[in-house]
Design a protein with these regions (language model features):
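Solvent-exposed, well-ordered loop and adjacent helix/strand elements within mature globular domains
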Residues: 1-130
Length: 130
């Protein structure tokens, strides 16, 4: 069943001050890369029973692109999505915006989705430009 939610969207990087002690490893135990998205814990079933999304789900942010859910945000956030970027400059350029988050598409298969190119975004390297 497809879900559509209005969320705040921002960008994050693998800087230790923005993550935990393993800045290049996601909560789903994958490596950070373009196309990875972190959702607030209220949106991820592992942390909130009945939440709409699981790790590995492909989600769409209107006007931004498609992403694979592989990370979560700190517990203080709600109805929020955080897109992973390689650099702080890219994350700052993206800024903070509102978008409609839809999905899930292709639940449970983050690796295959990323290999199909579903989860590419940003700065002239394919996928949707933010």
């Amino acid at each position: 069943r497809e879900i559509a939610l209005s969320v705040t969207v921002s960008g994050y990087t693998s800087r230790p001050c923005e993550t935990d002690s393993t800045p290049f490893v996601t909560a789903a135990n994958t490596t950070t890369r373009r196309g990875v998205i972190a959702l607030s814990r209220d949106l991820v079933r592992r942390y909130t029973p009945g939440a709409p999304f699981n790790f590995g789900d492909v989600v769409h942010l209107n006007g931004i692109g498609d992403f694979v859910v592989e990370d979560v945000m700190a517990g203080r956030w709600e109805r929020h999505a955080d897109i992973w970027f390689e650099s702080l400059d890219e994350a700052r350029l993206f800024g903070r915006r509102r978008a409609v988050l839809t999905g899930p598409y292709g639940p449970g298969d983050a690796y295959q989705a990323s290999q199909r190119g579903v989860a590419q975004v940003a700065s002239g390297r394919g996928g949707a430009a933010p």
